Amino acid sequence: MAKKSAVNRNEAVKALVKKFAEKRAALKAIANDETLPLEERFEARLKLAKLPRNSAAIRIRNRCEVTGRPRAYYRKLKMSRVALRELGSQGQIPGLVKSSW
């Protein structure tokens, strides 16, 4: 089980990303638009830099929904390999069968 503080911090980052997503996208569009004057684009870059660091989507860490574990994460199932193995052996995941040959 992951530390509650780490899981809560990640949730706070997700909230910030959601809050600033629209503003960040608009500033990025201005900064990357080559038809605009250089000063305007540079100003947009400065405004983008002033936004909170944790408002960038890259700061979100994929964590297991069951345990909060940050590593060995399967995106499709939103869980770690440890939780997958545990729930799979209990028969909690439909369609998952232990392989045998």
Swiss-Prot record:
Binds 16S rRNA, required for the assembly of 30S particles and may also be responsible for determining the conformation of the 16S rRNA at the A site. It comes from the Bacteria. The keyword rRNA-binding applies. Keywords: Ribonucleoprotein, Ribosomal protein, RNA-binding, rRNA-binding. HAMAP family: Ribosomal_uS14_1 (MF_00537). One of its GO terms (cellular component) is cytoplasm. One of its GO terms (molecular function) is rRNA binding. GO terms for biological process: translation. It holds the Pfam family Ribosomal_S14. Belongs to the universal ribosomal protein uS14 family. This is Small ribosomal subunit protein uS14. Transmembrane segments: none annotated.
